[in-house]
Amino acid sequence: MEVKDILKTVDHTLLATTATWPEIQTILDDAMAYETASACIPASYVKKAAEYVSGKLAICTVIGFPNGYSTTAAKVFECQDAIQNGADEIDMVINLTDVKNGDFDTVEEEIRQIKAKCQDHILKVIVETCQLTKEELIELCGVVTRSGADFIKTSTGFSTAGATFEDVEVMAKYVGEGVKIKAAGGISSLEDAKTFIALGASRLGTSRIIKIVKNEATKTDSY
């Protein structure tokens, strides 16, 4: 797999709580230059970013982030607001307290409501795999499939661990037809990126891949 093909799967991400506009601009510029799938940024920057890229790049943002336990009504509003401001893709965090209470019907209904607001915009559902048992992850693969979401996503990158090969393998086995997989959090090498893609991920959430590509290009130029 060529580097350009990996880059096409990347949601180039900056979600740091202290992210400044110049830093966001760099993310947007790099994402456009390297033709990534999108740039994933905080909701407060979506409107400005959408104006800045002027249709040349998909803008992704997050809702219910990073803990997921805001109310469904709050998440629905966040989704609507983000789309009105120019977001093309929404990454939502599920309420893990519902999962731990075994209330998967509530999780599914919340996703359905948010997908209804998204309409044709892409919705990715973050399940925070590091907090789940294997049985919970398998159940959530069914929940996400039935809800009509476009992607199931491993991680926020703000919890105890990010994506693992094992979790993506489980997702690929149990998620329904038409639902894609996004691996996110801790993807720090091109080899890891290739492995996640080979296991079934069609999107990668990472802030590091472009930096790695730039460093490799610098090494090559210095020879």
Swiss-Prot record:
Keywords: Cytoplasm, Lyase, Schiff base. It holds the Pfam family DeoC. Gene3D superfamilies: Aldolase class I. SUPFAM superfamilies: Aldolase (SSF51569). The active site is at 91 (proton donor/acceptor), 153 (schiff-base intermediate with acetaldehyde), 182 (proton donor/acceptor). Its EC number is 4.1.2.4. It catalyses: 2-deoxy-D-ribose 5-phosphate = D-glyceraldehyde 3-phosphate + acetaldehyde. Signal peptide: none annotated. GO terms for cellular component: cytoplasm. This is Deoxyribose-phosphate aldolase. It comes from Streptococcus pyogenes serotype M1.
